[in-house]
Amino acid sequence: MRTLTLNELDSVSGGASGRDIAMAIGTLSGQFVAGGIGAAAGGVAGGAIYDYASTHKPNPAMSPSGLGGTIKQKPEGIPSEAWNYAAGRLCNWSPNNLSDVCL
């Protein structure tokens, strides 16, 4: 994964307004929660979050699964059942793939 620079982000159409949008959302959220003081704090927080997100390099270990880049990807053309069986996983597949469970 390649990290974009601020110059690259700003060169995208509308990219320069990203920080302004983040600050506006923060201001509106803060105002909703705590009135005028919340609006001021929310705007500052929105800008700080944008600055952090635009310069931060993602850490694969912080992925939702907690496994990051340690999981091998299934090669193309191999059925999921065969891939999981070869890896020693016993999987129960649901028809709509919403509640698949692998042990």
UniProtKB/Swiss-Prot annotation:
Pfam families associated with the record: MccV
Gene Ontology biological process terms from the UniProt entry: defense response to bacterium; killing of cells of another organism
Propeptide: 1-15
Disulfide-bond pairs as recorded: C91-C102
Keyword terms, alphabetized: Antibiotic, Antimicrobial, Bacteriocin, Disulfide bond, Plasmid, Secreted
The keyword Secreted belongs to this UniProt entry's keyword annotation: yes
GO CC terms in record: extracellular region
Major location (coarse): secreted
Compartments it resides in: Secreted
Task performed by this protein: Colicin V kills sensitive cells by disrupting the membrane potential.
Protein name: Colicin-V
